[in-house]
Amino acid sequence: GKRTAGVDGIKLLTPQQRIKLVNQLKITGKSQPTRRVMIPKPGTNESRPLGIPTMYDRALQAVVKAALEPEWEAKFEPNSYGFRPGRSCHDAIGAIFLSIRYKAKYVLDADIAKCFDRINHKALLDKINTYPRLQKQIKSWLKSGVLDQGEIFPTKEGTPQGGVISPLLANIALHGMEERIKQFAGKSINQRREISLIRYADDF
């Protein structure tokens, strides 16, 4: 999606244009619709919808992400590995190995179908609970709509795959999943300790 244009038709910027864009960035609580682009899913005949923001919105999303990420990195569960700085799928594999190394365990391998597309906007915004201006801007991106074949459709749920801030928003939405599952595992502390939930984005 990096070299795909949004509704502004811009794919790349020169260094001079980037400097000019940075000087224009301002949190206004407004945004442009994303542009729908379909890309093939590896190993299947299905396609995945991307929502490509304008170049301006991409740059502003990077700024807002830089403001939010440190706070949430301090909160995120230690066994969450996807879309996080300094972490990779190899770290997730290592965590799985350590979890099953000394004792046989049942393993449930699952992923959340269409996770990005089904995130509840109100629940996510309530969870973020940041400064009003940032909150308004994030809500604007979530509600910006999507341009598909010349027609703009409303976005009532989800965060567009293709947005700079979307992976962080998805991780925020899924934060607390491990603790919630452990609450249903059993009443005793030992029963809860027996469960390891190792998550890489929407795969766990």
Give the ranges of each region predicted by the language model.
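Conserved polymerase palm-domain catalytic core
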Residues: Q24, G29, V37-M38, K75-N79, ...
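Charged boundary/loop elements
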Residues: G1, A66-G82
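Glycine-rich active-site/cofactor-binding loop and its immediate structural neighborhood
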Residues: P40, T44-P53, Q61
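Residues forming anionic-ligand binding surfaces in small-molecule and nucleic-acid pockets
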Residues: V37-E46, L68, F153-P154
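Active/ligand-binding-proximal structured segments within catalytic/core domains
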Residues: L60-L68, L169-A170
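Residues immediately flanking
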Residues: V7, A66, A110-I112
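Non-catalytic, polymerase-adjacent accessory regions of viral genome-replication enzymes
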Residues: G1-L21
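Short glycine-rich loop/turn motifs
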Residues: P33-R36, P49
